[in-house]
Curated annotation (Swiss-Prot):
Protein name: Outer capsid protein VP4
Motif YGL motif boundaries: 448-450
Species annotation: Rotavirus A (strain RVA/Pig/United States/OSU/1977/G5P9[7])
Region described as Spike body and stalk (antigen domain): spans on this chain: 248-479
Residues spanned by motif KID motif: 644-646
InterPro entries documented for this protein: ConA-like_dom_sf, Rota_A_VP4, Rota_VP4_MID, Rota_VP4_MID_sf, VP4_concanavalin-like, VP4_helical
Keywords assigned by UniProt, alphabetized: Capsid protein, Coiled coil, Disulfide bond, Hemagglutinin, Host cell membrane, Host cytoplasm, Host cytoskeleton, Host endoplasmic reticulum, Host membrane, Host-virus interaction, Membrane, Outer capsid protein, Viral attachment to host cell, Viral penetration into host cytoplasm, Viral penetration via permeabilization of host membrane, Virion, Virus entry into host cell
Coiled coil: 484-516
């Protein structure tokens, strides 16, 4: 049947997950982008498909194993292990604080009998008696003295198979390793002025942070990772660790990449944002004691300011979102003061400020990436507004404070009668503060937020300072300007197309023949047959189907199906067979995720209504999972979608994914589902209505939630194509047999077609009503 298309989409939409993840990982790892002119070298249009480009990240990741570095003399940072990797015997490292500690480490090859060897320690020839009785392991020994000319003593030998050694300055001590691998441990020597100890390494070395000491010990005992033991790892100078600090100018343009026709420019600018709120105050009719509305409204503000000696003319438009509606009613008399609705912005609200100026930065702001901004916080405090009553003392709304905190910036387009301007939309989240607001001579006091009555508090404007940065694709020739006709972004283009397509789709409902619709609803539509009405479908079928699946997998239906199996198993296992009110609540919760059991019998009806409304939303998924021979709402929905796709002249492969996804969520919103038990029918609707009745008389009977939940778990779920109201009307006016009633209850397509072919006005009217519900 036609609903097969939705099941195909639900099944196949998850097959694109892996390729999507690979693409996302690849784009997230991209660090820079070179613009290749490609086919655009011969045309006047810029590319509109953009990759992720450079992804800047302020997080500093410290490497686990930093190196190898060439032998050198340096002052190692404290709390860092210097991991030494010598290749020959002899002195491998030495260091001193030039006061009371001269310390060196010597490496001795395996199988060395006691012998005297001469070592060069701190510029002097020193003779030491050394030995290594191990036949296979190398031996590290520490030798130290307290004076430059004193005799050296030997300490803490380390017998090592990997031939690695490490030393660290930390907490007034110099730490080393001793023992025998693979069980070597750390030891230490006390030293004054330990942080000033300079060390000279005579072999390649690595640097490991102290918080990775466990990893350092693993290397000492078991050796370096295999990748460090290849000939491709070449030691570099320690100076490679030095960071060259370059301070970016606040206002500058940097060429990121350049080709023959296009170049990427990074634009850094400081910015001064001035804005103000506006509001609408409407008095209600009557004697003058009541106000209908006090609300925020957008307002544009124009101003000038200096930026690096340049005079900038700027425009800002301030609007709010997520307002909170308050009201006050002083009584029921015509002379009682009342406000039907006044708006307040609080923590759950957002303030949007669209900014545009006449500088060069905004003239080529068409193809933009890496947009970022840093702005200050601003506090907005409300003033007073007096409600002038005909008689009596005037109530005054006063106070209220919110702070605006930057929460992001996006590129937007402002349209005027003559031009479309690319602008920056700054989003601000809010926090409330003192003072609170109140209405004098009323009970309204100590409320927090900023009311719309007087949000500017006699100020001409609020001001925010900061800076923004973006990378824009512009013509390489500075004399050219990116055409403003291209300033509408790809997404805005798509939204405009979708808007036109929605209007066309909705107007096509009148042109659908019901008999053809029923025939189409019974066909097993697949991906290709569904989209065959689009031009060039054969060429674009594969990529178009993939795009539909990608978009569809983010739909509400696909998200719900991902939890369908768990929900069904939970429902089947947790439904109790007890008939108590408490067990009814628990059994319903298996479907509705209602965790609270019902204790008050008086609220049972309301609770059942809530439960059945939520159950009805899941019955669609149950019906999709267990298809019956009857026609369902998704068959009609898919058939209407197919018909409108074939008739449409606006649809394109770009708009198809959006339309299919939107249709799956919005077509036929008023759905009712039923389950049949012998001669009893149980129905539950999306609107929370529920009822049960007998098939032969259509007389209602008490609705047993326990029984309904059991039936839903074990029995097929059927779309109520012909609802109870239509059935009663049909029985009263035409008379139908019990078997016909059963067939209509099961949405038997053969019986439906018979009634439609007979031009039965009641059935036709019901189907036409369903078609009219298929709107976007």
């Amino acid at each position: 049947m036609a609903s097969l298309i939705y099941r195909q989409l639900l099944t196949n939409s998850y097959t694109v997950n892996l390729s999507d993840e690979i693409q996302e990982i690849g784009s997230a790892k991209s660090q820079d982008v070179t613009i290749n002119p490609g086919p655009f070298a011969q045309t006047g249009y810029a590319p509109v498909n953009w990759g992720a480009g450079e992804t800047n990240d302020s997080t500093t990741v410290e490497p686990l194993l930093d190196g190898p570095y060439q032998p050198t003399t340096f002052n190692p940072p404290t709390s860092y292990w210097v991991l030494l990797a010598p290749t020959v015997e002899g002195v491998i490292i030495q260091g001193t604080n030039n006061t009371d500690r001269w310390l060196a480490t010597i490496l001795i090859e395996p199988n060395v009998q006691t012998t005297n060897r001469i070592y060069n320690l701190f510029g002097q020839q020193v003779t030491l008696s050394v030995e290594n009785t191990s036949q296979t392991q190398w031996k590290f020994i520490d030798v130290s003295t307290t004076t430059p000319t004193g005799s050296y003593t030997q300490h803490g030998p380390l017998f090592s198979t990997p031939k690695l050694y490490a030393v660290m300055k930390f907490s007034g001590r110099i730490y080393t390793y001793n023992g025998t691998t693979p069980n070597a441990t750390t030891g230490y020597y006390s030293a004054t002025n330990y942080d000033t100890v300079n060390m000279t390494s005579f072999c390649d070395f690595y640097i490991i942070p102290r918080n990775q000491e466990e990893k350092c010990t693993e290397y000492i005992n078991h050796g370096l990772p295999p990748i460090q033991n290849t000939r491709n790892v070449v030691p570099v100078s320690l100076s490679a660790r030095e960071i060259v600090h370059t301070r970016a100018q606040v206002n500058e343009d940097i060429v990121v990449s350049k080709t023959s026709l296009w170049k990427e420019m990074q634009c850094n600018r400081d910015i001064t944002i001035r804005f103000k709120f506006d509001r609408t105050i409407i008095k209600a009719g009557g004697l003058g004691y009541k106000w209908s509305e006090i609300s925020f409204k957008p307002i544009t503000y124009q101003y000038t300011y200096a930026r690096d000696g340049e005079q900038i003319t700027a425009h800002t438009t301030c609007s709010v979102n997520g307002v909170n509606n308050f009201s006050y009613n002083g009584g029921s008399l015509p002379t009682d003061f009342a406000i039907s609705r006044y708006e307040v912005i609080k923590e759950n609200s957002f303030v949007y400020i669209d900014y545009w100026d006449d500088s060069q930065a905004f003239r080529n702001m068409v193809y933009v990436r890496s947009l970022a901004a840093n702005l200050n916080t601003v506090t907005c405090t409300g003033g007073s507004y007096t409600f002038a009553l005909p008689l009596g003392h005037y109530p005054v709304m006063t106070g209220g404070t919110v702070s605006l905190h930057p929460a992001g910036v996006t590129l937007s387009t402002q349209f005027t009668d003559f031009v479309s301007l690319n602008s920056l939309r700054f989003r601000f989240r809010l926090t409330v503060g003192e003072p609170s607001f109140s209405i004098t001579r009323t009970r309204v006091s100590r409320l927090y937020g900023l009311p719309a009555a007087n949000p500017n508090n006699q100020r001409e404007y609020y001001e925010i300072s900061g800076r923004f940065s973006l990378i824009s694709l512009v013509p390489s020739n500075d004399d050219y300007q990116t055409p403003i006709m291209n300033s509408v972004t790809v997404r805005q283009d798509l939204e405009r197309q979708l808007g036109e397509l929605r209007d066309e789709f909705n107007s096509l409902s009148q042109q659908i023949a019901i008999s053809q619709l029923i025939d189409l609803a019974l066909l097993p539509l697949d991906m290709f047959s569904m989209f065959s009405g689009i031009k060039s479908t054969i060429d674009a079928a594969k990529s178009m189907a993939t795009n539909v699946m990608k978009r569809f997998k983010r739909s509400n239906l696909a998200s719900s199906v991902s939890t369908l199996t768990d929900a069904m198993s939970d429902a089947a296992s947790s439904i109790s067979r007890s008939s108590s009110i408490r067990s009814i609540g628990s059994s319903a919760s298996a479907w509705t995720e209602v965790s609270n059991s019902i204790a008050d019998v008086s609220t049972t009806v309301d609770t059942v209504s809530t439960q059945t409304a939520t159950i009805a939303k899941r019955l669609r998924l149950k019906e999709i999972a267990t298809q019956t021979d009857g026609m369902n709402f998704d068959d009609i929905s898919a058939a209407v979608l197919k018909t409108k796709i074939d008739k449409s002249v606006q649809i394109t492969p770009n708009t198809l994914p959006e339309i299919v996804t939107e249709a799956s969520e919005k077509f036929i919103p008023n759905r009712t589902y039923r389950v049949i038990n012998n001669d009893e029918v149980f129905e539950a609707g999306m609107d929370g209505k529920f009822f049960a009745y007998r098939v032969d008389t259509f007389d209602e009977i008490p609705f047993d939630v326990q029984k309904f939940a059991d039936l839903v778990t074990d029995s097929p779920v059927i779309s109520a194509i012909i609802d109870l109201k239509t059935l009663k009307n049909l029985k009263d006016n035409y008379g139908i047999s019990k078997q016909q009633a059963f067939d209509l209850l099961r949405s038997d397509p053969r019986v439906l077609r018979e009634f439609i072919n007979q031009n039965n006005p009641i059935i036709r009217n019901r189907i036409e009503n369903l078609i009219m519900q298929c709107r976007l």
